[in-house]
């Protein structure tokens, strides 16, 4: 199993042991879910179902939970997906509110960029953020992403219509800034 790590966090596949931490830190947090595509979870039984779905998804996709190195606690999730020959997109990116403002989001995004450009040899990384999610937009811009386009999207679980802003980073720009 691949484990990716940076100074303060690491990524690895989920396990049922992480259910309570993900429920408390992410899935039940309405402030986080308002910018995400998952429905907030209201009880531990639903969190167990969500974790089983996450584990199943991660078996055939590049999805991970994010862990705090100091505590080994699950504090978020992240993933990338192949969208064309050598283009990749983030498939979700989230850090628990209690861990925000510590630079973990940037460490997380840089880990994903390293996976896409250094390991998978991708040409382009696509990042999407809900219009108004200034923390997410500022994060991708701080890593060199540039605005590409916008589209109106309807979130499935609550039929909420929003504008999804799309940002891109090319391998050439990544390698000139962070290259290995």
Q: Can you annotate each of these PLM segments?
A:
Residues 31-32, 56-59, 121:
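Generic structural signal for secondary-structure transition and capping sites
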Residues 52-65:
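A short helix-loop-beta-strand connector motif used in the catalytic cores of GNAT acetyltransferases and
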Residues 26-27, 36, 55-58:
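Hydrophobic residues in alpha-helical segments
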Residues 31-53:
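Conserved GNAT-fold acetyl-CoA-binding loop/helix
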Residues 1-21, 25-29, 67-180:
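Acyl-donor (CoA/ACP) binding surface of acyl/acetyltransferases
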């Amino acid at each position: 199993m691949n484990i990716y790590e940076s100074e303060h966090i690491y990524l690895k596949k989920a396990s049922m042991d992480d259910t309570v931490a993900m429920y408390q830190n992410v899935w039940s947090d309405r402030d986080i879910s308002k910018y995400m595509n998952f429905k907030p979870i209201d009880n531990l039984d639903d969190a167990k179902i969500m974790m089983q779905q996450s584990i199943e998804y991660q078996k055939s996709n590049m999805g991970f939970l994010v862990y705090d190195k100091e505590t080994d606690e699950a504090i978020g999730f992240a993933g990338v997906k192949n969208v064309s020959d050598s283009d990749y997109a983030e498939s979700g990116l989230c850090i628990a509110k209690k861990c925000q403002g510590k630079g973990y989001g940037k460490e997380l995004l840089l880990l994903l960029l390293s996976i896409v450009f250094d390991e998978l040899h991708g040409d382009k990384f696509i990042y999407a953020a809900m219009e108004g999610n200034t923390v997410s937009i500022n994060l991708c811009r701080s890593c060199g992403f540039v605005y590409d386009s916008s589209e109106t999207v309807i979130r499935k679980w609550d039929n909420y219509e929003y504008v999804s802003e799309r940002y891109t980073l090319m391998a050439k720009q990544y390698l000139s800034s962070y290259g290995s």
